[in-house]
Amino acid sequence: MKTKTKPEIKSDILSWWLLIVVPLVGIVVVNLPPNLRFILDRFSNTIPENFDANYRYHFSEGLRNNPNPKEAIQQEIAFYQQRLAIDSRSGLNRAALAGSYLKMARATGEGGWFLLAEQAAQRSIADLPFDNKGALLVLARIAEARHDFATALRLAKQVGSDNEEAIALEVTSHLAMGKVSEANAAAEALVNRIPNLGSLTLRALVRESQGRDAEVLQDYRQAMAVEEPGEVAGSARARSLLGRFYARRGQFVQAKALFLEALRLAPRYPLALIYLADLETRQGNYREAEGYYSKVSAYSGGVETVFDRIVDRGMARVKDLQGDAIESRRLRDKAEAGLRQEQVSGSGGFGHRRDLASLLLEKGRSQDVAEALALMQEEVKIRRDAVTLDTLAWALSSAGEWQKADRVMAEIVR
């Protein structure tokens, strides 16, 4: 058996962000002003009649006056900063500020907010070294995003198994490491404890990794049945992930309908926009794909975010398919420069070593293949999920090590 030598760029390049950086429940996106939201309702007119009614969002009236989450987070930050101006040694207030910084990082995708969250959490623990679960959870999420899973799990254990966010951390960390049995046990415990939109979505992701497709759909339907009006962003996330599930199985009409429904809820949601762009690319609709990628960049307002490299690579693929080799090379070089800078910046890079390896494999030069293989041999020491193993197999086959590549692929299908 020969392993693939040049797979297409998949939306799997976002997996680390989906499972780690994005929170369990009530994720935050930066929405359009309410008076512009109903322009996006036109999306619903394009949704096919056979769209599963279970996936419709049933609180549309509540979208009319949905506030801008970014402004709400800014108010939170200002509130805790004022509290700390009065009592600068308050560990609890600083832990809350760290949590608000982390919310803003998730809302904007800007790396600077993650750094502020980490610094605030560390100082909070210095001021309040005992019973400081809020600060520990912030540090655990940041460690996990940097693929320091051992630290993330250690911190989650310190928080305790009676904390839903700590259990969610166990799910995502174990899943990223390829420890599916442990992830499944944690997901079951979480759903048994709190069967809500977030926990059921997490269990669906675990079951998808196990190939339990019927149960995946059951979990998503149950998740949407119990969703509440106040968790619009979590509802958008669930539909985006379910859309990805359908897209992976070639059910493009259902997938697109779910992505559009997600954007009706959260018009600037980058996850849905990137998945839509990927879907349009796969179907040969390159102009539409470019449009969705461009929206991700435009909504960031020119500020660097964690999505920039994904957009650059996606656009490079579109240009390549359009026959524009010069622009495709420019975009790949831009993405590579950004990924390399993150590797040496000391900011952690948030686990982009695999992305850099994948990009180098796309370029295909012998020196790039050698570097990519070295990167992946290091990466699998800390995580062995399916996407990581797939990238390692790609690197091995590109280097002519077919037997080793086949053994890695066999590990994936076990």
Describe each PLM feature range.
Residues N93, G134-A135, A166, S199-L200, ...:
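TPR alpha-solenoid repeat register
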Residues M104, T108-G111, R146, M177, ...:
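Structural motif corresponding to the intra-repeat A-B loop/turn of tetratricopeptide repeats
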Residues S11-L19, P23-G134, A145-H147, R154:
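N-terminal leader/linker segments that initiate helical-solenoid repeat arrays
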Residues G99, K103-R106, R141, T172, ...:
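Residue-level recognition of tetratricopeptide repeat
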Residues I73, A107, F114, F149, ...:
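TPR-repeat structural position
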